[in-house]
Amino acid sequence: MSTHSNHPFHLVDYSPWPLTGAIGAMTTVSGMVKWFHQYDISLFLLGNIITILTVYQWWRDVSREGTYQGLHTYAVTIGLRWGMILFILSEVLFFVSFFWAFFHSSLSPAIELGASWPPMGIISFNPFQIPLLNTAILLASGVTVTWAHHSLMESNHSQTTQGLFFTVLLGIYFTILQAYEYIEAPFTIADSVYGSTFYMATGFHGVHVLIGTTFLLVCLLRHLNNHFSKNHHFGFEAAAWYWHFVDVVWLFLYITIYWWGG
């Protein structure tokens, strides 16, 4: 690697993963647009495969740099922390756009929607059934990931394992319930602006839950291989930050779109 012990800066070798990641993202988005317009889904699936393979190999390299090569010095870790903070901030603004679209349409419904919200003919979800259960699941997962973090800080290996395991399990449970809700939904993404804003907001949140669950599963596997210590575990810390962000976004989704907007 390019980084040596005589300076703290984060210099890495040339890597193909930013390029393949950009290609994967472009292919995924292009394929999704074509899929939404009744074209074949194959381009979307190809983009997903490229992105998943890129993420796997990129994270593998980062784990090797930090765990086996000692490249994640204190100064490097500070840079990684700021990078994660700015990434989460960008994600906040990403979801603000969906809430903006929702409130723009719901606070003053157009005459084409029957001047009502939800629009005429739309049967919305009961917020006190599956959505409320999903809220409880995500709040519980926030507790378990915090339990795992505190256990790691106390060098309690078994309780860290249990906390991470239950968090991953709750994330999978949430995803299954969300998929069931979509399957049983009485409206589609094409059913007015209500369907569009509902599925875009909850769908992208669901994607973030899948990413967060994968992130935490990787942390669980790394923990089982003794990659973390109480003084060196930023990979886990970043996953916990991301998971708490997903929790908070869901609370806003539940209160605004499911409860107030339904």
Swiss-Prot record:
Keywords: Membrane, Mitochondrion, Mitochondrion inner membrane, Translocase, Transmembrane, Transmembrane helix. Its main location: mitochondrion. One of its GO terms (cellular component) is mitochondrial inner membrane. GO terms for biological process: mitochondrial electron transport, cytochrome c to oxygen. It is found in: Mitochondrion inner membrane. Belongs to the cytochrome c oxidase subunit 3 family. Component of the cytochrome c oxidase (complex IV, CIV), a multisubunit enzyme composed of a catalytic core of 3 subunits and several supernumerary subunits. The complex exists as a monomer or a dimer and forms supercomplexes (SCs) in the inner mitochondrial membrane with ubiquinol-cytochrome c oxidoreductase (cytochrome b-c1 complex, complex III, CIII). This is Cytochrome c oxidase subunit 3. It comes from Drosophila yakuba (Fruit fly). The gene is mt:CoIII.
